[in-house]
From Swiss-Prot:
Any Gene Ontology CC annotation: cytosol
NCBIfam families, sorted: S20
Compositional bias segments (type: Basic residues): 1-15
Keyword Lipoprotein: no
Organism taxonomic ancestry: Bacteria, Pseudomonadati, Campylobacterota, Epsilonproteobacteria, Campylobacterales
Gene3D superfamilies on file: Ribosomal protein S20 (1.20.58.110)
GO MF terms, alphabetically ordered: small ribosomal subunit rRNA binding; structural constituent of ribosome
Superkingdom: Bacteria
UniProt protein name: Small ribosomal subunit protein bS20
Record keywords: Ribonucleoprotein, Ribosomal protein, RNA-binding, rRNA-binding
Length: 90
């Protein structure tokens, strides 16, 4: 255990931030999973709605500093491509 008051505070802050980041990362994974399920089932309407939500959430987490800009851009690009592919084939 830390002896300095500032070190104890840092430990508390790290714990809080870790929990918060874990919540956001889990939320991102769930949103992406829902979108991929809709794509696999070839449900265009549901996929487009899920894409809208995913796009909004990913960009929000970039502004909060949870994700890096290029990571979110890569995820959005790949998700867009998968939805576009099923929309064209339908």
């Amino acid at each position: 255990m830390a002896n300095h008051k500032s070190a104890q505070k840092r430990i508390r802050q790290t714990k809080t931030r870790t929990e918060r980041n874990r919540y956001y990362k889990t939320r991102i994974k769930n949103i992406v999973r829902d979108l991929r399920e809709a794509v696999l089932n070839k449900d265009v309407a549901k996929a487009q709605e899920a894409l809208k939500i995913a796009n909004k959430e990913l960009h929000k987490y970039v502004s909060k500093g949870i994700l890096k800009k290029n990571t979110a851009a890569r995820k959005v690009s790949r998700l867009n491509a998968s939805v576009k592919k099923i929309a064209q084939s339908a």
